[in-house]
Swiss-Prot record:
Spans annotated as Disordered: 1-35
Stated family: Belongs to the UreD family.
Protein name, as recorded: Urease accessory protein UreD 1
Short name of one Pfam family: UreD
InterPro entries named among the record's database cross-references: UreD (IPR002669)
Length: 288
């Protein structure tokens, strides 16, 4: 005699794809001056998911190195940084390696960076490059609120495939939004949207002229607009074959745009320019 038969699995259950593991990385960091003229110290730090911060010793200023232990971003992952500098604090933020945005079968990954700088605070936002692979889909948001006397220098380098391997972005999504406010007023806004055959879009003369990598450098600091001629001279010194760059200044800030046939030469241009413009060496991880 047999017991009751178990119901047959439904076709939906038989063909169901396993649930994906989504990465959800979060960093919250608040820093402030240790004492008048005595450097900067960590006041609050919270880490979640695969996001970690490391603080190398022996650096001139407090330096935070962002680590993504997941090894990259893909398929609907979410990462966020909430960074606050109290009045008078100084910080350099970078990443341990290039951030890789891997292919997705549909879900869009999201990266949100939110910065708050008090009066007299100074932040150098210097992550290493971001590399997009074919069919990557990502939306990034960069928002900063600065007191009138705060100083922000931010640099971002993005590679659309690895030129040395002949990679192309046949289909993908790259949406990048920058909003920076000074004293509560919007000082800088920029949005980039590349969707579909990104490499083909970049091949158009009016968009990228065949570039495979781009960079943005922004200086929102007191006196930045007056440094335009210096910036142009330093760009000329930093240039290398396969790169092109230009600087402009308005509304109290200075912006640099650069393009490269490959990310390596463009990264070199950015590093040389920033080292001269800031009169400080790049973070050590940039040299590894």
């Amino acid at each position: 005699m047999h017991g009751p038969l178990a119901p047959a699995p439904s076709p939906e259950r038989l063909g169901a794809a396993p649930a994906r593991q989504r990465s959800d990385g979060r960093i919250r960091l608040r820093v402030g001056p240790a004492r008048p003229g005595g450097g900067t110290r960590i006041l609050d730090l919270a880490e979640a998911g695969p996001s970690r911060l490391r603080f190398p010793r022996g650096t001139c200023a407090l330096e935070a190195v962002l680590v993504n232990t997941a090894g990259g971003v893909a398929c609907g992952d979410s990462f966020a940084i909430d960074l606050a500098l109290e009045p008078g604090a100084d910080l350099v933020l970078t990443t341990t390696a290039a951030e890789k945005i891997y292919r997705s079968d549909g879900p869009v990954s999201r990266i949100a960076n939110t910065l708050t700088l008090g009066e007299g605070a100074g932040l150098a936002w210097l992550p290493q490059e971001t590399i997009l692979f074919d069919r990557a889909r990502v939306r990034r948001r960069f928002e900063a609120d600065l007191a009138d006397g705060a100083a922000l220098i931010a640099a971002e380098v993005v590679a659309f495939g690895r030129a040395a391997r002949g990679e192309r972005i046949v289909d993908g999504l790259f949406a990048d939004s920058w909003r920076i406010r000074r004293g509560g007023r919007l000082a800088y806004a920029d949005s980039v949207l590349l969707e579909g055959p990104i490499s083909d879009h970049l091949a158009r003369p009016a968009i990228g002229g065949g570039a495979r990598a781009c960079a943005t450098i922004l200086d929102v600091s007191p006196g930045a607009e007056a440094r335009l001629e210096e910036a142009r001279a330093r760009l000329a010194e930093a240039a290398s074959p396969g790169t092109t760059a230009a600087a402009s200044a308005w509304n109290g800030h200075l912006a640099v745009r650069a393009l490269g046939d490959a990310v390596g030469p463009l990264r070199g241009l950015v590093a040389r320019f920033l080292a001269g413009y800031r009169a400080l060496p790049m973070p050590r991880v940039w040299q590894s």
